[in-house]
């Protein structure tokens, strides 16, 4: 299941294999997850945004035994009120993530194996002379991943 406010990103997520794509701005994310799974929540949540709203939504999607992976890079000083009772009652596992020396090689191996499709997520390409445009595009909600190189026109 994918939670994403931008329509084009939801569409790409569905193309890449998400069973459902939910708009967390206009839909009740927790209610949709419960309806789609037919149970109390999901087994694993990967939070990739880093803001307190997305983090709260991530924890609201949990059930007993869920693992919550906080994969995002939040702003320095960001805090989140966490119900320790929920952690206890639901037996949640909370995992932080940071890049490690093996990460890049594992990513390359996944790409080379064909298990990861890059084409749908490489949405824009810019020549080096248009670096400023590339940065602005990456900051917008119109892009997923932006490439900059000497071979792009």
Regions found by a protein language model. Give the residues of each.
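Helix-to-beta-strand junctions that scaffold the AdoMet/dcAdoMet cofactor pocket
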Residues: 62-64
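C-terminal hydrophobic helical "lid"/dimerization subdomain
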Residues: 56-60, 101-153
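Hydrophobic residues in well-ordered beta-strands that form the structural core
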Residues: 2, 70, 94-96
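Residues in the short beta-alpha loop(s) of Rossmann-like NAD(P)-binding domains
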Residues: 5-6, 74, 100
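Glycine-centered, small-residue-biased loops immediately flanking beta-strands
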Residues: 66-67, 144
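Conserved catalytic-site loops of classical short-chain dehydrogenases/reductases
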Residues: 44, 67-68
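Adenosine-nucleotide cofactor-binding segment
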Residues: 1-57
């Amino acid at each position: 299941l994918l939670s994403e406010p931008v329509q084009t990103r939801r569409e790409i997520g569905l193309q890449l294999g998400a069973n459902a794509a939910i708009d967390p701005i206009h839909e009740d994310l927790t209610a949709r997850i419960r309806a789609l799974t037919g149970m109390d929540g999901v087994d694993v949540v990967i939070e990739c945004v880093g803001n307190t709203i997305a983090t709260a939504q991530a924890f609201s999607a949990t059930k007993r035994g869920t693992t919550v992976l906080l994969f995002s890079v939040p702003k320095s000083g960001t805090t989140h009120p966490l119900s320790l009772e929920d952690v206890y009652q639901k037996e949640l596992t909370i995992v932080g993530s940071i890049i490690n020396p093996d990460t890049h090689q594992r990513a390359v191996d996944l790409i080379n194996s064909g298990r990861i499709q890059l084409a749908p997520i490489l949405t824009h390409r810019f020549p080096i002379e248009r670096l400023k445009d590339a940065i602005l595009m990456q900051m917008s909600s119109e892009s997923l991943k932006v490439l900059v190189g000497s071979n792009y026109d």
